[in-house]
Amino acid sequence: MKNNIVIITGITASGKSELCDNLIEKYGNISIINCDSKQVYEEIPIITAQPPKQEVFYKLYGYVSAKENYSVGLWLEDLEKEVNHALENAQIPIITGGSGLYISSLIKGLSSMPQISQKVRKNVSELRKNLSKEEFYKLALSKDPRIQGKVFMNDSHRLSRALEVITETGKSIFVWQENRQPPLFNNFKIYTILPKREDVYRKINSRFITMIENGAIDEVKKLLSMNLAPHLPAMKAHGVPEIIKYLKGEITLDEAIQIAQTNTRHYAKRQYTWFKKQFLNAEVIDCANKLKIF
């Protein structure tokens, strides 16, 4: 196999996990390595749809404490070890997940991003909380005009990040992103799964209901009991902020479910746009069942 590292990416709820299960069952000599920024956290396996811990084929899932502000740089270090271990043991590494920053850093190299002070992070977080979406977007755009057409109003996470960087350094986040380290590997084949939107949206809705039934609320209760800072990544996993509002009595459970489903669908919509513009050498398929790797 010329490209002995496989990357399977795509939008949320596109069937990546089911595909990996099938590949393990069919071939066996593979190592599934996580490329999802929230599935690394140990305390939230249900709401991030992690595979069972006893599955020895799966690597880099549920092994980081939610107390940690885990970064793409740390993930690349862990990834390199797992890929090399797989290759040394005659296994094919299959890197899978939908976190765009992780995948982009793997393929194109890691950007030399600046450290953001707690003061700036807190100030931006307060602005994000107190301003409307439109006001927050206009503020970010006034500080960094380069975000126009690249970061959109509903993408509050990327807007916050852009505002943090320009506030901390005086330089656009895109200036920092242009300064990249060499990529870890270049011998890979990438597949992007982009199913029909209505199928994805339907699965997002049903999957969140299943997560609630399987104990997601208790999972978030335990997360709350840890008294974590709200800016930590685990606290921003899809469904966590909405369930926290429910547990605090701010909204009903039905409202929490509906809002979480809506927010995740919006995230999937943004992923569609992003993945279509990225990785032009990827093989794009509309259904995980159509993917043929070997």
UniProtKB/Swiss-Prot annotation:
<keyword id="KW-0547">Nucleotide-binding</keyword>
<dbReference type="GO" id="GO:0006400">
    <property type="term" value="P:tRNA modification"/>
</dbReference>
<dbReference type="GO" id="GO:0052381">
    <property type="term" value="F:tRNA dimethylallyltransferase activity"/>
</dbReference>
<dbReference type="InterPro" id="IPR039657">
    <property type="entry name" value="Dimethylallyltransferase"/>
</dbReference>
<comment type="function">
    <text>Catalyzes the transfer of a dimethylallyl group onto the adenine at position 37 in tRNAs that read codons beginning with uridine, leading to the formation of N6-(dimethylallyl)adenosine (i(6)A).</text>
</comment>
<protein>
    <recommendedName>
        <fullName>tRNA dimethylallyltransferase</fullName>
        <ecNumber>2.5.1.75</ecNumber>
    </recommendedName>
</protein>
<keyword id="KW-0819">tRNA processing</keyword>
<keyword id="KW-0460">Magnesium</keyword>
<dbReference type="Pfam" id="PF01715">
    <property type="entry name" value="IPPT"/>
</dbReference>
<feature type="region of interest" description="Interaction with substrate tRNA">
    <location>
        <begin position="36"/>
        <end position="39"/>
    </location>
</feature>
<keyword id="KW-0067">ATP-binding</keyword>
<comment type="subunit">
    <text>Monomer.</text>
</comment>
<feature type="site" description="Interaction with substrate tRNA">
    <location>
        <position position="99"/>
    </location>
</feature>
<dbReference type="InterPro" id="IPR027417">
    <property type="entry name" value="P-loop_NTPase"/>
</dbReference>
<feature type="binding site">
    <location>
        <begin position="12"/>
        <end position="17"/>
    </location>
    <ligand>
        <name>substrate</name>
    </ligand>
</feature>
<dbReference type="GO" id="GO:0005524">
    <property type="term" value="F:ATP binding"/>
</dbReference>
<feature type="site" description="Interaction with substrate tRNA">
    <location>
        <position position="128"/>
    </location>
</feature>
<dbReference type="InterPro" id="IPR018022">
    <property type="entry name" value="IPT"/>
</dbReference>
<keyword id="KW-0808">Transferase</keyword>
<feature type="binding site">
    <location>
        <begin position="10"/>
        <end position="17"/>
    </location>
    <ligand>
        <name>ATP</name>
    </ligand>
</feature>
<comment type="similarity">
    <text>Belongs to the IPP transferase family.</text>
</comment>
